[in-house]
Amino acid sequence: MASGSKDIVIVGGSVIGCATAYYLTQLGALDGCRIVVVEKDPSFATCSTARSAGGVRQQFSTPENILMSQVMIDLLRNLKDRFGPDADVGFREQGYLILASREGADVLRSNVEMQRAHGADVHLLAPEELRKRFLWLSTVGVACGSFGASGEGWIDPVSLTTLFRTAARGAGVEYLVDTVTGFELSGQFIVAVKLASGRRLPAGAVVNAAGPSAGAVAALAGIRLPVEPRKRYVYVIDCRAAPEALRQAPLTIDTSGV
């Protein structure tokens, strides 16, 4: 805190930035300081949060990601206890199904073993088990699959962001519609955040919550962060006239391609 300021500036006001702001208030970070969130797109029209599939899973290849997901799942299951009786993010706990070809089967088996060791309710299924459980699924070219029977599914990420943002504002967090254009440094410390509007925010700490733009934000401080945006695609299929079994399908991943 070379600037002498105790204020915390969070760059990015989508789900990560809003969650960070909210939990900082729960830790008492507002005592004697300001928390300011800077977001250039408060409508969420172009942010990654609004354009994501909203997937929630524990099927990762590193323990850290699994443990972080478990914290999130506990929050989703107890959302009303924290945010009130009307809190709803459309959590559909229908699971994740990850399919593997013969080439990827060993990696999938290893991942499932590690996931289960960390408490994830994930099951490795052979092709015949997959066909019995998911009648709509063709297992041609599939060596095995891993299914998250609980604690996985999807949400509406904008609704979750709105909950965090509303709660953070209610606790005293300030939100600015602006764009970060640079930082003032004192040695290795950031002492102020510069905005496109010309404003200058003294800062004792800065949180980079810019999502896929985090690399560009870090570069403003002379830091190389290997994060960059990459275009991906989400296809939505209208299944209202589909059989019940298909409407209850998990979020399915086939890494071998289509």
Range-by-range predicted roles:
Residues 2-16, 36:
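Beta1/beta-strand and adjacent pyrophosphate-binding region of the FAD-binding site
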Residues 16, 43, 213:
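Conserved Rossmann-like nucleotide-cofactor binding loop
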Residues 19, 83, 183-189, 195-258:
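Flavin-dependent oxidoreductases
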Residues 22, 26, 162, 166, ...:
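Short, well-ordered alpha-helices that flank and scaffold nucleotide-derived cofactor binding pockets
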Residues 25-48:
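Glycine-rich FAD pyrophosphate-binding loop
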Residues 53-133, 257-258:
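Dinucleotide-binding Rossmann-like beta1-alpha1 core, especially the glycine-rich loop
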Residues 134-142, 184-191:
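A short, glycine/Asx- and small/polar-enriched loop/turn
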Residues 147-205, 213:
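Helical element adjacent to the flavin cofactor pocket in flavoenzyme catalytic cores
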